[in-house]
Amino acid sequence: MQRAATIERQTGETNVALMLNIDGSGRVDIATGIGFLDHMLHLFARHGLFDLAVRADGDLHVDEHHTAEDVCICLGQAFDRALGERRGLVRTAHAYVPMDEALGFVAVDLSGRPYCVVDAAFVTPRVGRLGTDLIAHLFESIAVHGRMNLHARVLYGRNDHHKVEALFKALGRALDAATRIDERLGGVVPSTKGVL
């Protein structure tokens, strides 16, 4: 069974179409109109080995907030839909990823309970056209709409591009590990409650 989903979101601010294949090979086709966000989603998918296609048209004449947020809402929804009942999942995983002088850490639990904590300090207001104040909100959008517990932290670093890149790579690697099927579970839901 292919674990994939297509999400479309149309609002008065944005028009987003996103396709995710969890069991992919890292193929990407991404155009959001925000170059740095495209770059982060590209390396997220490559490090997670997810196939990811994104097309977004938004009110970038206002700012990048609505477009970036709605893309990450759709990404979270795609994970939630593609995972279905989440039977047989490893469920929890974490990853440390260095990017030159920066070190990022992400831990996830595909528990069905959305919660997000981001501990990251940035020194510049934006990287490219993406405001650094949005990074925590983007991770929160993925967590809430993906119904997952997500903790992200920049342990240290100087360059804001490197810090954000370490976090997105770590998120891809953590989700790759957490979404794997553990054959020892025999297809049951990975919870003592029997449901997620």
Swiss-Prot record:
Location of this chain's protein in the cell: Cytoplasm
Pathway in which the depicted protein is active: Amino-acid biosynthesis; L-histidine biosynthesis; L-histidine from 5-phospho-alpha-D-ribose 1-diphosphate: step 6/9
One example of a Gene Ontology biological process annotation: L-histidine biosynthetic process
Main localization of the protein described in the UniProt heading: cytoplasm
Stored InterPro entries: IGPD_sf (IPR038494), ImidazoleglycerolP_deHydtase (IPR000807), ImidazoleglycerP_deHydtase_CS (IPR020565), Ribosomal_Su5_D2-typ_SF (IPR020568)
This enzyme's EC code(s): 4.2.1.19
Reaction equations catalysed: D-erythro-1-(imidazol-4-yl)glycerol 3-phosphate = 3-(imidazol-4-yl)-2-oxopropyl phosphate + H2O
Keywords recorded for this protein, A-Z: Amino-acid biosynthesis, Cytoplasm, Histidine biosynthesis, Lyase
Presence of keyword Cytoplasm: yes
PROSITE patterns associated with the record: IGP_DEHYDRATASE_1, IGP_DEHYDRATASE_2
One GO CC annotation: cytoplasm
GO molecular function, one term: imidazoleglycerol-phosphate dehydratase activity
Enzyme category, top tier: lyase
Protein name: Imidazoleglycerol-phosphate dehydratase
Species per Swiss-Prot/TrEMBL record: Roseiflexus castenholzii (strain DSM 13941 / HLO8)
